[in-house]
């Protein structure tokens, strides 16, 4: 049912996503996706939104042993990019995503979606911003 709705109505990016990705591209900053979604759906969603070309790598939970909040997906993403976790910034919208990136050693920026960070989660954050439009100056 969800797939039919997506095929019919499409899918929209979060506000500021295209502008952020365009800014990163202009600055020659590599972007990757580290998601709990499988590769087929990830490719489909990114293609439908028109942002697939901005990402050098797509890393999905099926490519690693343990999913978020384990650090596996971020450690693997960093390895695929040829970067150390300390050279990477993760943008996350969920507590499990924040914990995953933090445990891997990445700087983590949270853009809360359904869950606001509690005091413990805030300790893991480099920054917490209300929207993707607030990220470019942090990179």
Feature locations, PLM:
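Metal-dependent phosphoesterase signature
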Residues: 1-19, 27
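Intrinsically disordered/low-complexity terminal segments and short unstructured peptides
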Residues: 4, 34-36
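Pocket-edge positions in alpha/beta enzyme catalytic cores
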Residues: 9-12, 34, 65-66
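Hydrophobic beta-strand core positions in alpha/beta domains
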Residues: 32-33, 110
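Asp-based, Mg2+/Mn2+-dependent phosphohydrolase catalytic module
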Residues: 22-25, 38-39, 43-139
